[in-house]
Amino acid sequence: MPDLVAYTDGACSGNPGPGGWGALMRAKDGDTILKERELKGGEADTTNNRMELLAAISALEALDRPSTLTIITDSAYVKNGITGWMHGWKRNGWKTSTRKPVKNVDLWQRLDEAQSRHTVTWEWIKGHAGHEGNEKADELARAGMAPFKTGKRGKDG
């Protein structure tokens, strides 16, 4: 069975501001890439953290059957949230340890639901450090943001 890996990244021009997300999905056998799929999208008014979350959500939601995969992100927010903080948030009714509402709760709940169908290993890597998969995810995120940046809209937007 091939290994499934998703590199995810978010980008934002201003925070908040126009943003994009990207995910590079790869099925691999050792070092051989068997299949690759690129996903991207964006929003006109968002934050970097929301785009990071949407990248991971989109990767998971793109899978049409329960899968085992590794999600590689340069977002400590996503990695720490999904592997550590979320358990407490859920126990506290989606409130932080200081009893404040969890920011981006809509996306955290969506990520929780999307992850529940799969067996996921989460890995954090340093962003903009020359890691090929992460650099491609960053490129996709910036491409997803491009239509929402001022002066970059097409004639239909």
From Swiss-Prot:
CDD domains: RNase_HI_prokaryote_like
InterPro entries, per database record: RNase_H, RNaseH-like_sf, RNaseH_domain, RNaseH_sf, RNaseHI
Binding site for Mg(2+) 1: 9, 52, 74
GO CC term, one of those recorded: cytoplasm
UniProt KW Nuclease keyword: yes
GO biological process: DNA replication, removal of RNA primer
GO molecular function per UniProt: magnesium ion binding; nucleic acid binding; RNA-DNA hybrid ribonuclease activity
Catalytic class of the enzyme: hydrolase
Entry's cofactor comment: Binds 1 Mg(2+) ion per subunit. May bind a second metal ion at a regulatory site, or after substrate binding.
Gene3D superfamilies the record matches: Ribonuclease H-like superfamily/Ribonuclease H (3.30.420.10)
Family, similarity comment: Belongs to the RNase H family.
Protein name: Ribonuclease H
Biological classification of the source: Bacteria, Pseudomonadati, Pseudomonadota, Alphaproteobacteria, Rhodobacterales
